From Swiss-Prot:
Subcellular location: Secreted
Pfam family name, one: Toxin_22
Function: Probable ion channel inhibitor.
Main location: secreted
Annotated tissue distribution: Expressed by the venom gland.
Organism: Cyriopagopus hainanus (Chinese bird spider)
Higher taxonomy: Eukaryota, Metazoa, Ecdysozoa, Arthropoda, Chelicerata
Free-text domain note: The presence of a 'disulfide through disulfide knot' structurally defines this protein as a knottin.
Family statement drawn from the similarity comment of this UniProt entry: Belongs to the neurotoxin 14 (magi-1) family. 01 (HNTX-16) subfamily.
Biased composition (Basic and acidic residues): 58-69
Signal peptide segment: 1-21
Any one GO cellular component localisation term in the record: extracellular region
Source taxon at top rank: Eukaryota
Protein name: U11-theraphotoxin-Hhn1a
GO molecular function annotations of the record: sodium channel inhibitor activity; toxin activity
Length: 113
């Protein structure tokens, strides 16, 4: 009967000690998995961010090409006063000093070439 008790006690002690080791091992394993999961989430987040930045960069590039400053400025029509230093007459027109009409208002007008 004593041998049965000793054997049972020995099995009990081994089970408890190995169980504790397994518990610590499981805890360490879970910590490693969570750290790997965090690094995986960081990697996935960076990958998604890169994928989203590519179309955004293309859209911003298109917007910069079509800015308001790049469009053609409006031109001045025939018989309209113009500035001698900055003539913005339409194509086919020249900024000239008027002959008789308009000499009292402004010194230069857009005329046909």
């Amino acid at each position: 009967m004593n041998t049965v008790r000793v054997a049972f006690l020995l099995v009990f002690v081994l089970a408890v000690s190995l169980g504790q080791a397994d518990k610590d091992e499981n805890r360490m394993e879970m910590q490693e998995k969570t750290e790997q999961g965090k690094s995986y989430l960081d990697f996935a987040e960076n990958l998604l961010l890169q994928k989203l930045e590519e179309p955004e960069a293309k859209l911003l590039e298109e917007d910069s090409e079509e800015s308001r400053n790049s469009r053609q400025k409006r031109c001045i029509g025939e018989g309209v006063p113009c500035d001698e230093n900055d003539p913005r007459c339409c194509s086919g027109l020249v900024c000239l000093k008027p002959t008789l009409h308009g000499i009292w208002y402004k010194s230069y007008y857009c005329y046909k070439k």
